[in-house]
């Protein structure tokens, strides 16, 4: 990949990640607003609204990412699709895209912190560690492993209908968010975690790097390798020509 293409990919990732963090951070407030307006009570209604909003958000961002040439808002997604052999960006391009995503996330977190109405501002804050670092790191590794494997299966081997794909990813994401809420927030997206850590002045700690960067990458790459070994058929070997 040429320098210009790599820079364009990094810029696209920065923009998409900025918009993603800006939008996804409003899910809690949006769910509250919708359920209050429709006078819906009960956790099951709140979960249904959240899944629906997340599905719409993912569907829109899938279109946006495709329009920008395959942009991404999750560093582990870039690494996983590369490790699985689904995409083949250059390592130089990846080296530019990951910090661009982190910078975009910082911008998105700062922007929504200013734009969010005062009555919903307490719902912001991003993922935070609620257990000891090793337990939190293990939780992020497992959660990122599961969501990465699920996303690869749904996108590469799942149904062709993009709406069904988006709905399946939304349900998987919400289930894992609820499962990891008591451990790390959770994040499953190092850029998103970094953006909020920067806002809360926790971005330059070993704990942040260990829990929200190292272990999610390990989980994502392990999932990609397993997916590649189990679900991607290797190309047939050319037959040797007879002398």
Curated annotation (Swiss-Prot):
A motif (NPA 1) lies at residues 74-76. A motif (NPA 2) lies at residues 189-191. It is a multi-pass membrane protein. The keyword Membrane applies. InterPro entries: Aquaporin-like (IPR023271), MIP (IPR000425), SIP1-1/2-like (IPR044222). The keyword Repeat applies. SUPFAM superfamilies: Aquaporin-like (SSF81338). It comes from the Eukaryota. GO terms for molecular function: water channel activity. Disulfide bonds: none annotated. Keywords: Membrane, Repeat, Transmembrane, Transmembrane helix, Transport. It holds the Pfam family MIP. GO terms for cellular component: membrane. The chain crosses the membrane at residues 9-29, 45-65, 98-118, 136-156, 163-183, 211-231. Coiled coil: none annotated. Its main location: membrane. It is found in: Membrane. PANTHER family: AQUAPORIN SIP1-1. Aquaporins contain two tandem repeats each containing three membrane-spanning domains and a pore-forming loop with the signature motif Asn-Pro-Ala (NPA). Belongs to the MIP/aquaporin (TC 1.A.8) family. SIP (TC 1.A.8.10) subfamily. Aquaporins facilitate the transport of water and small neutral solutes across cell membranes. This is Aquaporin SIP1-2. It comes from Zea mays (Maize).
